Regions:
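Conserved "HGTGT" condensation-loop signature of ketosynthase/thiolase-family condensing enzymes
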Residues: 1-134, 157, 164-171
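Cysteine-centered functional microenvironments
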Residues: 130-144
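A generic local secondary-structure boundary/capping motif
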Residues: 150-151
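Anion (oxyanion) recognition and catalysis
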Residues: 154
Length: 171
């Protein structure tokens, strides 16, 4: 099996994009801790931008950067989204709501709680109609996503965008 990486997107605290992160990751520049800075996602319609949770914005921004660095269009590429636990903030908010007497869970929070929410927002943002897979394998999520993407490339012979994303859980 032969696969290769055609483009990378990277967004993390103190690492604002792949090009800016390479010297830090290579050890030729010092890492300076900083806040997580997610670019404004003009690719999403305004209504979707307002209700999109941070972890989904993170996934979409990283995917957009990877495709831009690869010189590929989003609408014609299959995707694999992988996360160790999905959107912990949304799940935490839902669990807190369920402890209240009214137990009225926001429909927006509920639809953002599913593990394939980033894939759905990706489709809305890019108009993509290609297959999408959403995975969760806890600490092995990146490896599971890489295996899934490589398998799709090997079997189907087309490019696949792998988006691995995570955000800290609430305290």
């Amino acid at each position: 099996m032969r696969v290769y990486v055609n483009g990378i997107g990277l967004i993390a605290p103190g690492l604002n994009g792949w090009a800016a992160s390479v010297p830090i990751l290579a050890g030729s520049a010092d890492y300076i801790a900083g806040p997580l800075t997610i670019p404004v996602l003009e690719i999403l319609p305004p209504a979707e931008r307002r209700r999109t949770p941070t972890v989904v914005k993170l996934a979409i921004a990283a995917g957009c950067e990877a495709l831009a660095n690869a010189g590929q269009a989003a609408a014609k590429i299959a995707t694999v989204f992988t996360s160790s636990g999905g959107d912990g903030d949304v799940i935490h908010q839902i669990c807190e709501t369920l402890t209240e007497p009214e137990r009225e869970v926001s429909p927006t929070r509920f639809h953002n709680s599913v593990h394939n929410a980033p894939a759905g927002y990706w489709g809305i943002a890019t108009g993509a109609h290609e297959p999408s897979t959403s995975l969760c394998a806890y600490d092995a999520s990146f490896a599971a996503g890489l295996i899934e993407a490589a398998t799709q490339v090997s079997i189907d012979g087309h490019s696949v965008l792998l988006v691995a994303y995570d955000a800290p859980y609430p305290e």
